[in-house]
């Protein structure tokens, strides 16, 4: 907390205030046992030093079963949650959740609890892992994902593709054409969507 106070004070003194304060980093921020308290403290600091800045939370959605995490995320301006597919086998192969009880249906149900105060972030790609195809731009992945988005009714959807080298060299970017086609289908449901290539 002290480091954040010093940084915000320095920025305020320089007249260079941040646009956004983001909870992210090395690991899952919502897994911190005091995440809710950290959000509250950050809101107070934001209000004091940079009241125009927005608070964003980037999460893999694995801690949404904890009510205190959901309540804290309701307080941030941009509650950004990952949902790369609705296929459990795909998630186990690609995302490799640490929790063996992880189920995408549970995550979708928890995302619906935000009542629209959520931004869904999804990465589309091509390639293979351990000899298995992990391209998720095919209709068998996109159609059920779109149905989940319809059920969740997020404020916005952000779709993107691989941006930097991955641990597995067999992974490749989805094309702008594919991302734009998916983006249009989200927008056709009346939900704002951005695509990053």
At which residue positions do the language-model features occur?
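Conserved hydrophobic residues forming the short capping helix/wall of the S-adenosyl-L-methionine
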Residues: 12, 46, 186
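Binuclear metal-ion centers of metallo-dependent hydrolases, dominated by the metallo-beta-lactamase
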Residues: 175-197
């Amino acid at each position: 907390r002290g480091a954040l106070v010093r940084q915000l004070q320095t920025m305020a003194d320089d007249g260079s205030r941040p646009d956004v304060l983001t909870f992210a980093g090395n690991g899952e921020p919502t897994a911190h046992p005091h995440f809710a308290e950290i959000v509250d403290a950050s809101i107070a600091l934001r209000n004091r030093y940079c009241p125009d800045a927005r608070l964003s939370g980037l999460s893999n959605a694995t801690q949404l079963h904890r009510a205190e995490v959901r309540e804290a995320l309701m307080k941030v301006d941009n509650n950004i949650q990952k949902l790369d597919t609705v296929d459990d086998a795909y998630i186990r192969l690609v995302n490799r959740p640490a929790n063996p009880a992880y189920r995408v249906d549970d995550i979708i149900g928890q995302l619906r609890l935000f009542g629209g105060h959520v931004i869904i972030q999804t990465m589309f790609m091509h390639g293979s892992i351990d000899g298995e195809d992990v391209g998720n731009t095919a209709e068998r992945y996109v159609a059920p994902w779109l149905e989940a988005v319809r059920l969740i009714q997020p404020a916005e959807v952000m779709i993107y593709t691989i941006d930097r080298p991955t641990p597995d060299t067999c992974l490749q970017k989805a094309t702008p054409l594919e991302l734009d086609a998916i983006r249009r289908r989200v927008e056709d449901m009346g939900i704002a969507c951005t695509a990053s290539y």
